[in-house]
Amino acid sequence: MINSYPLTENDLVATQKVAEAFGHQFGDNASLAPSPASASEDFSIFGRTWGVPCVFWFVGGTDPAVYAKAKQDKTVNKIPSNHSPKFAPRIHPTLETGLQAMLTAASAWLCPRTTA
């Protein structure tokens, strides 16, 4: 049983590679520079255990109008997140964006862009 998780730290080189790929895919809508966030994620164990670089990112799924109002009211931290029973992302386009993000990140290694 695991009662605690180590800090999740993105690998710098891998993060730069994923950020570049996200920039090509999503343009100005992509950002891998969120504010630090504390969370209990088992994700941080994978890279350490397997000795591989890891990159953890978030995919926003809140209705843009709800987010804009929360930002205006300075209550963004009260928007329910993924472990809350009140979590209610907009399924579309959230699911499509999440899939595109995963495929884009994987493709950065599996199908790297080449320059002539």
Task: Show where each model-derived region lies.
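Metal-dependent amide/peptide-bond hydrolase catalytic core
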Residues: 1-116
